[in-house]
């Protein structure tokens, strides 16, 4: 009964339930007079009047000053309750189809390629970008899909890191990537962590609503908010920021939502970017709701956020690759496809298979 629950905790950096005893109720909110603000003063801030990322007692918080996550009482309830979908989940053999990627370096067109979970390859103007590099089976997680290409064949120019949970930032992946001339674009205070995994990677840090300083590149990349949290070991909770990314290239926008709950930050992003061509949105790891709602979006919430962002094409992610929650592996995509069939999704929906090339 507890397998996926232990795996979820391991994926966020908790080796056992007992570690959670050290946490306060992580939903608690600070007061405005206890908040300090920080940002990378060397970067341009794209939101007028934005003071920087809020922090309370040296730890990052969300826009509403919450620390996100679920309190210990709810985690305990989850661990001691039966999963009502236990048998359905046990019998779910869903596996995302995989297309082999051979001759990746011969690709010339601009495109998006899904590698599973939150890892995407973006080929823009001859440069390769990789989001949230987790291409192995980290932190005792079993990966249910194979890779379409060996890690050693991924010649990446830029890594885009949304946050540091183990199912998004994998030490093995970072250490095995060919790192010559590779740059990591990361949240505030993540640089030291990345370089401890691979000292050859150049690191640039940004706060929310800040544009990375990229010389002679055909694209702009802006770091934006997400409603989430950070933890890899019990004592570093929220010491490193989390977020999402906007990529602007040749008149198109690609939004990578990272890991996030549904919150007001989507409207803030929409106010800066009138339309978004491609929205890469998380749809899985949402049950039970009383634990996951403060961390992740379910398919319906992801579509609501997509509408608020005025997105044109919805590309789902964060499902079917790892077992992180109580829902069956096939459920997130089934719910999303039902919304598409019902005409609920305003815009197009493209559920990529792993290794499938989407020209843009």
Language-model regions, residue ranges each:
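Divalent metal-coordination and catalytic microenvironments
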Residues: 122, 132, 163, 221, ...
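Cap/insert and terminal regions of metallo-dependent hydrolase folds
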Residues: 2-7, 11, 38-41, 54, ...
